């Protein structure tokens, strides 16, 4: 038996096959263009995203016989508006990183803000989907016309892909929990929240489970069931082998995303982390998690490269000592504001402590350290099991300097996975569950334990200096009014 997992991510779309022997192999990877039409705005061509999924699906169906089911991982908060009659997008996809709606959210009445937090567990932030959906209805004439005509699809990107592939208008509970429109306890669209954001409830797709016989994809003369669909970070959580309370993972991708399983009901976290649905299998109750992220991690590395301070990630692999922080140089990776636990879109990215003898190497090192220190801040706000190391993956985790500094800043071991494609692996494993089978563990699913070095106490003692740098980035942002 084989499961085809498609991971539609922020920078590319990847397809993998996982068989019942535990072998995970790549079908293909297609990159897509990212658009920045104005400051704070981030968009994708939704047609390009869908075409890439379809191309990889067709390739897999040609090359891989006996595909028993298909699993789809999505970007989470990214949204699309489309014509349900011809399945064509009416506007570019608005990406989770987009900040255009923050000013609208800042103007919400206090009672509305309280209602959003109480019902969804989420802060009123442009990161989440609801304000993006509202913006499309208010600002794109074709979208408003389609709503009046009764043929509008308006939802997170997974719904667009599923509608296009199956003609079913649906999303799953993990993705719906990222919109700010779903009651987190009842796991249904909330009418009051829809009124707050100006998004008619009857425009939204139905909410279903993350696994099970969800829909049927008819393509290339074959009918194959869609057996799993969920947010990419929740798929990665499953791929890490996290199953019980206290199990946690951190993914160092475009942003840093840390999740920890909390149990069968959502909990309120007083440290700025947000409750979310981890997954829900068909016929079962939901499992919940706490989630926190940093908007710009690998994105900050890419930005540093674009400035000419490095040619690739390999240039960031520097000798372990002395750290930039020990030399008085800090970098705050708030290029799109600060997410958990601060939730401050006015914060700005900055290097602090530049001198005449500061080199590009020092600045590169400070970037890695800033990402690691922000990530450690996230982990320490999660209810992580004390007897298990945090499990890590993502492109930045492959950099020895970075992952060692992260372990030192955290002061505890980090379990670094050998398998880099944890999102695809988790989605595929979810696919096996959707077919009523036990997850097929990947044959290369080992790990290396990264233990804190002797420098850890010294680095941890400097955490307060970094916290002050973060506070300075927030104060400077408020002074200059940088938030959209």
What are these language model-derived features?
Residues 62-96, 123-129, 158, 162-183, ...:
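Short beta-strand-loop/turn "lid" adjacent to the catalytic site in phosphate-handling enzymes
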Residues 30, 35, 94-101, 177, ...:
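Short, acidic/turn-prone active-site loops that include or flank metal/cofactor-
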Residues 45, 98, 232:
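Short, conserved phosphate/pyrophosphate- and ester-handling motifs at nucleotide-, phospho-/glycolipid
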Residues 4-6, 102, 109-171, 181-183, ...:
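Active-site core segments that coordinate phosphate-bearing ligands/cofactors
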Residues 1-91, 118, 209, 221-228, ...:
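N-terminal glycine/serine-rich phosphate-binding loop of ATP-dependent small-molecule kinases
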Residues 191, 197-212:
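A conserved helix-loop-beta module that forms one wall/lid of the active-site cleft
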Residues 32, 74, 97, 211, ...:
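Residues that line or immediately flank small-molecule/substrate-binding pockets and catalytic motifs
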């Amino acid at each position: 038996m084989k499961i085809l997992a498609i991971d539609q991510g922020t920078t590319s779309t990847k397809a993998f096959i996982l068989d019942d022997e535990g072998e995970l192999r790549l079908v293909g990877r297609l990159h897509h263009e990212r658009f920045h039409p104005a400051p704070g705005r981030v968009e994708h061509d939704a047609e390009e995203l869908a075409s890439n999924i379809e191309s990889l699906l067709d390739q897999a169906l040609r090359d891989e016989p006996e595909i028993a089911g298909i699993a789809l991982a999505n970007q989470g908060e990214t949204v699309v508006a489309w014509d349900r009659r011809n399945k064509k997008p009416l506007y570019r996809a608005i990406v989770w990183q987009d900040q255009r709606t923050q000013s609208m959210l800042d103007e919400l009445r206090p009672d509305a803000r309280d209602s959003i937090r109480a019902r969804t567990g989420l802060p009123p932030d442009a990161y989440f989907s609801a304000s993006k959906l509202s913006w499309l209805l208010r600002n794109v004439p074709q979208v408003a016309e389609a709503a009046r005509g009764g043929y509008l699809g308006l939802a997170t990107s997974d719904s667009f892909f599923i509608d296009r592939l199956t003609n079913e208008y649906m999303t799953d509970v993990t993705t719906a929990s990222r919109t700010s429109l779903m009651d987190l306890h009842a796991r249904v669209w909330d009418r009051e929240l829809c009124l707050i954001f100006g998004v008619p409830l009857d425009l939204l797709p139905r909410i279903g489970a993350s696994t099970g016989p969800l829909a049927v994809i008819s393509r290339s003369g074959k009918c194959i069931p869609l057996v799993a669909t969920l947010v990419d970070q929740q798929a990665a959580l499953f791929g890490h082998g996290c199953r019980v309370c206290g199990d946690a993972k951190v993914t160092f991708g475009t942003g840093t995303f840390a999740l920890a399983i909390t149990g069968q009901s959502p909990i309120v976290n007083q440290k700025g982390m947000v409750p979310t649905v981890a997954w829900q299998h068909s016929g079962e109750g939901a499992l919940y998690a706490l989630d926190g992220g940093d908007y710009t991690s690998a994105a900050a590395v890419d930005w540093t490269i674009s400035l000419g301070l490095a040619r690739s990630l390999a240039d960031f692999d520097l000798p372990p000592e002395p750290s930039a922080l020990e030399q008085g140089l800090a970098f705050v990776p708030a290029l799109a504001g600060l997410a958990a636990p601060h939730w401050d879109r006015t914060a700005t990215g900055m290097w602090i402590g530049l001198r005449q003898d500061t080199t590009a190497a020092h600045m590169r090192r400070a970037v890695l350290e800033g990402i690691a220190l922000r990530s450690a801040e996230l982990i320490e706000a999660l209810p992580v099991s004390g007897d298990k190391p945090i499990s890590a993956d993502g492109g930045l985790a492959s950099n020895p300097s970075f992952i060692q500094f992260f372990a030192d800043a955290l002061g505890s071991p980090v379990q670094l996975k050998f398998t880099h494609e944890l999102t695809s692996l988790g989605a595929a494993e979810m696919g096996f569950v959707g077919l009523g089978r036990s997850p097929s563990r990947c044959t290369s699913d080992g790990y290396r334990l990264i233990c804190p070095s002797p420098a850890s106490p010294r680095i941890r003692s400097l955490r307060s200096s970094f916290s002050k740098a973060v506070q300075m980035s927030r104060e400077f942002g408020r002074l200059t009014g940088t938030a959209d």
